[in-house]
C-alpha cells in the first residue's frame, strides 16, 4: 500500500487545534468569520487557517516532503460575536517562517491573499494582527518617528497644523505655490498636496515642487519658523516615485508624501528607506482605505492597515477625525491611534484591540486628523488626539471669508488658545466653545471663522462600531 491517503478531508482535522499554546514568535490574527449556512464554525476557522498558510483543497503527495506541524497555520480559538447571528471571531496563529523578512507585501499576500474569496465563507474580515518583535525587528519602520520630527521642526508641546491645498485639481503650479505661501505665512506648520495631485497636464510635478519650495522658504524667512509642504511623490512606477523624492531632497524641503495603498506596500517601503537615508520626513495618505475597511463584516480593519504602515514606514498617517466628515468612532479610532504612536499597547476589546502589541523600538507615527474639521472642533481635537498629532484643515483654512492667510491665523490662534487652556487645567470638553469665543475677542480672523462655521455639522451614525 502507498503511504499516502488521497482524497478530500475536513480542514478541521488538521488545522483546528484548540489546545495549541501560541508562541512568542507567532503572528496572530483575529478574523471575523461569517460561515455559509451549514458550515460549522470550527471548519470555517480551520479553513481560514489552512488557506492562508499551507493548505490546499485536497491532500497532496508533496505534503509528505515537508513538516506541516512546523509550517501550518492553526485556528486555536473561536468565539461567537455577541449580538450577531452566525458570526465568529477565529484566532489563527502563523509560524514566523511562513513570512519573508521585512516584507509587508508578503505578509499580506499570505494572510489575506487568497482566503477572502473562499466559498465556504459568506464573509471574512481581518480585525487585528499581533506582530511579534521577532518579525517587526526585520522592518526599518518609520523613516524618523515622532521625536526626531519634533527636533527637526523645533516644535514642541502642541499638535502640528496642516492644510490641504484646494481646489485639489486644476490650479496652475504658480497659483498653487501662492496658496501654499499664504497658509504657511499665516501660521500653519504644513501644507499638503491632495492625494490625487501627482503630475497632471495642468500642473506637472516638477513645476509644483519648485513653486512650493519657493513658497516654503519665503514663509520660513518671514515667520522664523520651520515650514513644510507634503510634496506628493506618488507616481506610476517606483523609479519615477524615487526620482521625485530625489528632486525634493535636492530642493532641501523637509517632507514628501505617498499614497501607500494605491502606490502599494513595496513602493512605500522603498520610499521609506530612501527617506531615512536622506533625512526626509514621510507623510502617508490612506487613499482607497475605505474600499478595504469600511464594510463591517468583510475586508480588513483599518487598525491592521495602520500597523502595516508602521512596519512599511511613514512619519504621518491619516487616521480619521472622530468629529469631522469622515468615518471614525472615538474609542476605536483612539485604539489604532495608540497602535501608531505607542511602544506597547495592551489588549483591550472595548477599543477593538484583540492582542497586546509590543513594538519594542520601532519609531511611532503621528496620526493626522483631516476631513471636514474647522475652528469649533479645535478643543475636541486637542482633547482627543493630544500633542502628538497633526490637525489638518483644508476647507477650514481656505474657506475663510478673508482668504487663506487669515484662515491659517484663525486656526493657529484657536490651537494655541486650546493648548494654553489645557495647560492651565481647564476642561476642553466642557469649556471648549467658551475658550474659542474668548480667543476670538482679540483675533478678528478667528471671530470671522467662528461666524462662518457656527452651524456646520456632519451628523451621521458611524459605521465602525464594535
Swiss-Prot record:
Marked site: Transition state stabilizer: 325
Catalytic activity from the UniProt record: 2 (2R)-3-phosphoglycerate + 2 H(+) = D-ribulose 1,5-bisphosphate + CO2 + H2O; D-ribulose 1,5-bisphosphate + O2 = 2-phosphoglycolate + (2R)-3-phosphoglycerate + 2 H(+)
Positions annotated to bind substrate: 114, 164, 168, 286, 318, 370
Residues binding Mg(2+), per UniProt: 192, 194-195
CDD domains in the cross-refs: RuBisCO_large_I
EC number, as in UniProt: 4.1.1.39
Keyword terms: Calvin cycle, Carbon dioxide fixation, Chloroplast, Disulfide bond, Lyase, Magnesium, Metal-binding, Methylation, Monooxygenase, Oxidoreductase, Photorespiration, Photosynthesis, Plastid
Sites bearing N6-carboxylysine, chain numbering: 192
Listed GO MF terms: magnesium ion binding; monooxygenase activity; ribulose-bisphosphate carboxylase activity
Post-translational modification N6,N6,N6-trimethyllysine, affected residues: 5
Record's GO cellular component terms: chloroplast
SUPFAM superfamilies in UniProt: RuBisCo, C-terminal domain, RuBisCO, large subunit, small (N-terminal) domain
Catalytic residues of the enzyme: 166, 285
Cofactor note: Binds 1 Mg(2+) ion per subunit.
Coiled-coil segments on the chain, per record: none
Stated role: RuBisCO catalyzes two reactions: the carboxylation of D-ribulose 1,5-bisphosphate, the primary event in carbon dioxide fixation, as well as the oxidative fragmentation of the pentose substrate in the photorespiration process. Both reactions occur simultaneously and in competition at the same active site.
Family listed: Belongs to the RuBisCO large chain family. Type I subfamily.
Protein name: Ribulose bisphosphate carboxylase large chain
Gene source species: Poliothyrsis sinensis
